[in-house]
């Protein structure tokens, strides 16, 4: 017999006023004013609305671009050093894995780990792939595309991650 577990009536009635960040990807990074009191911005001015979302690339969400000449992945890895990252190519996939052990930050101790997997286009030259992390923590994985009919060189191999000294970001669309 399944029993539905529900919040107490007062939490259901006031649901919009309770922050729910348990499954948010920003969990553990601290609370913002709008997390605690989201109704304040609308009561102060009906036309003022605090943004509930951070920029896409600041949130750890990746951006993939595939144009005529090249294939590029941009990924925010600001919490990881190049030594914490592993990038490898297997068949038609690139796997990016980041892991750092427990360390202290502003809110206590934290350890992080992520695993991303992307399908490479069949015409990407896998012998010319490169990966770097900019000074501001933006990982850029790229590879040129080859003309149709040429061998793209599919095999498993690790891609070294280099560090750039200048800040980098994804070009705007």
UniProtKB/Swiss-Prot annotation:
A GO term for molecular function: unfolded protein binding
What is one GO biological process annotated to this record? response to heat
Q: Which residues bind Zn(2+) 2?
A: 107
Residues with the modification N6-acetyllysine, per the entry, are 70, 99
The entry's Zn(2+) 3-binding residues are 154
Listed InterPro entries: A-crystallin/Hsp20_dom, Alpha-crystallin/HSP_16, Alpha-crystallin/sHSP_animal, Alpha-crystallin_N, HSP20-like_chaperone
Question: Which terms are listed as keywords in the entry?
Answer: Acetylation, Chaperone, Cytoplasm, Eye lens protein, Glycoprotein, Metal-binding, Methylation, Nucleus, Phosphoprotein, Zinc
Question: Which residues are annotated with the PTM Phosphoserine?
Answer: 45, 122
Region ranges (Required for complex formation with BFSP1 and BFSP2)? 1-63
Looking at the record, the residues that make up the sHSP domain are 52-162
Q: Which residues carry this modification: Deamidated glutamine?
A: 6, 50, 90
Where does the record place Basic and acidic residues bias? 153-167
Residues of the region (Disordered) are 144-173
Q: Which residues bind Zn(2+) 1?
A: 100, 102
Q: What subcellular compartments does it reside in?
A: Cytoplasm; Nucleus
Q: Does the keyword Flavoprotein apply?
A: no
Q: Which residues carry this modification: Deamidated asparagine?
A: 101, 123
Q: Which GO terms describe its cellular component?
A: cytoplasm; nucleus
Residues listed as glycosylation sites in the UniProt record: 162
Q: What family is this protein classified in?
A: Belongs to the small heat shock protein (HSP20) family.
Q: What does this chain do? A: Contributes to the transparency and refractive index of the lens. Acts as a chaperone, preventing aggregation of various proteins under a wide range of stress conditions. Required for the correct formation of lens intermediate filaments as part of a complex composed of BFSP1, BFSP2 and CRYAA.
Q: What name does this protein carry? A: Alpha-crystallin A chain
Q: Which organism is it from?
A: Equus caballus (Horse)
Q: Which gene encodes it?
A: CRYAA
